[in-house]
Curated annotation (Swiss-Prot):
Substrate binds at T26, G27, S28, T29, D79, G80, A81, D82, K92, G93, G94, G95, K119. Pathway: Carbohydrate degradation; pentose phosphate pathway; D-ribose 5-phosphate from D-ribulose 5-phosphate (non-oxidative stage): step 1/1. GO terms for molecular function: ribose-5-phosphate isomerase activity. It comes from the Bacteria. It comes from Xanthomonas axonopodis pv. citri (strain 306). The gene is rpiA. This is Ribose-5-phosphate isomerase A. It catalyses: aldehydo-D-ribose 5-phosphate = D-ribulose 5-phosphate. InterPro entries: NagB/RpiA_transferase-like (IPR037171), Ribose5P_isomerase_typA_subgr (IPR020672), Ribose5P_isomerase_type_A (IPR004788).
Length: 215
């Protein structure tokens, strides 16, 4: 699937315009996008990064990494996904960067999601849904998620987010109402962010292939 990821990432470069500040996500597909962005780095003003991992890769390419507090809203955000449904709703957060990813998506006029074909699903939920949680609330949130959804929350032991929080991965879900589930989980005290991108889905999904498919 690495070639499909690369093809999707290369296609996303078509959306980058001269003078832009580009929002950049996290993950294996985004790594290909950063490499492609490095070839045109002289044409853009810089990037806003969703993770320390992406920040390091951007800087390796000589791309200036900027603070979202100073840039204001962005024209473009490019990121991957763990799952994508036909309505461009996403599950994200396998790399534990979901909160910063959601912040940048919210601040961006256009959100381009780049995936390989294996990430396309008819209904979200086969991939465990990540939920970022304040550490002291981990058990409370897990109990409430179980009661609310019937899904099985599993603590991602040993993982600490860039924000200093922990992640619960909720298994065995069928997300037939992504917007409703995102809203409900966000109401649980201690939840920082839910890895459902439904209220703010992708505007465009690029599926890697020969040629790439644009949805």
């Amino acid at each position: 699937m690495s070639e499909a990821k690369r093809l999707a990432a290369e296609k996303a470069i078509d959306y980058v315009e001269d003078g832009m500040i580009v929002g950049v996500g996290t993950g294996s597909t985004v790594a290909y996008f950063i490499d492609a962005l490095g070839r045109i780095g002289h044409r853009i003003k810089g990037a806003v990064s969703s993770s320390e991992q992406s920040t390091a890769r951007l800087r390796q390419h000589g791309i200036e990494v900027l603070d979202l507090n100073h840039t204001g809203n962005l024209s473009l955000y490019v990121d991957g996904a763990d799952e994508c449904d036909p309505n461009r709703c996403l599950i994200k957060g396998g790399g534990a960067a979901l909160t910063r990813e959601k912040i940048i998506a919210e601040a961006s006029e256009r959100f381009i999601c780049i995936v390989d074909p294996s990430k396309q699903v008819p209904v979200l939920g086969k991939f465990p849904l990540p939920v970022e949680v304040i550490p002291m609330a981990r058990s409370l949130v897990a109990r409430q998620i179980l009661a609310l959804t019937g899904g099985q929350p599993v603590w991602r032991d040993g993982v600490v987010t860039d924000n200093g929080n922990v992640v619960l991965d909720v298994h065995h879900l069928q997300v037939t109402d992504p917007v409703g589930l995102e809203r409900s989980l966000n109401q649980i005290p201690g939840v920082v962010c839910v890895g459902l991108f439904a209220r703010r889905p992708a505007d465009v999904v690029i599926v890697g292939g020969e040629p790439p498919q644009v949805i």
